[in-house]
Design a protein with these regions (language model features):
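Conserved class I S-adenosyl-L-methionine
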Residues: 1-34, 36-45
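Class I SAM-dependent methyltransferase SAM/SAH-binding core
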Residues: 50-93
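A short acidic, Gly/Pro-enriched loop at the edge of an enzyme's catalytic core
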Residues: 96-104
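A short SAM/SAH-binding and catalytic strip from SAM-dependent methyltransferases
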Residues: 103-118
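A short glycine-rich, Lys/Arg-flanked "PGG" loop and its adjoining helix->strand segment in the class I
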Residues: 121-133
Length: 137
């Protein structure tokens, strides 16, 4: 079943340079004084929220349930000249990132409200398993 989250042709219609700048400012403020060099977004979507991290020197990685969103994110990253690792997987089962650890792991956007409370706990446990010691969830 298709959803808005697979409609990459319309998903980013409201995104523009103003939003990009706002996200970049947000991340700069949020991460100021933090030792965050690697960041995993487990619901990266088209990348609009977290791609600006690349401009701040953060090594970004991302995953998403929607392969269409991963494709769109790859296109946007390539167009901006960013090399990021992207994988298609569900944030409730992050085995696609097995063996990797990140300074910060997050689920950006509006993904967590789409699953029940037990699944939120599962997702948070999965995410926490990928956070480096002293890192951020």
């Amino acid at each position: 079943m298709s959803s808005i989250y697979d409609r990459t042709d319309i998903y980013d219609l409201l995104e523009d340079q103003t939003h990009w700048s706002a996200y970049k400012k947000h991340w700069k403020t949020l991460l100021q004084g933090k030792n965050v060099h690697s960041f995993l977004d487990v619901s990266i979507g088209s990348g609009s929220v977290t791609l600006p991290l690349c401009e701040l020197g953060v090594q970004l990685a991302g995953s998403d349930l929607s392969e269409e969103m991963i494709r769109k994110c790859k296109e946007k990253a390539a167009a901006a000249g960013y090399e990021i690792e992207l994988k298609s997987c569900d944030f409730r089962k992050l085995s696609c990132w097995e063996g990797k650890q990140f300074d910060c792991v997050a689920s950006t956007g509006n993904s967590l409200p789409h699953v029940n409370n037990d699944d939120v706990l599962t997702a948070l446990e999965q995410m926490n398993s990928l956070v480096k010691k002293g890192g951020y969830l």
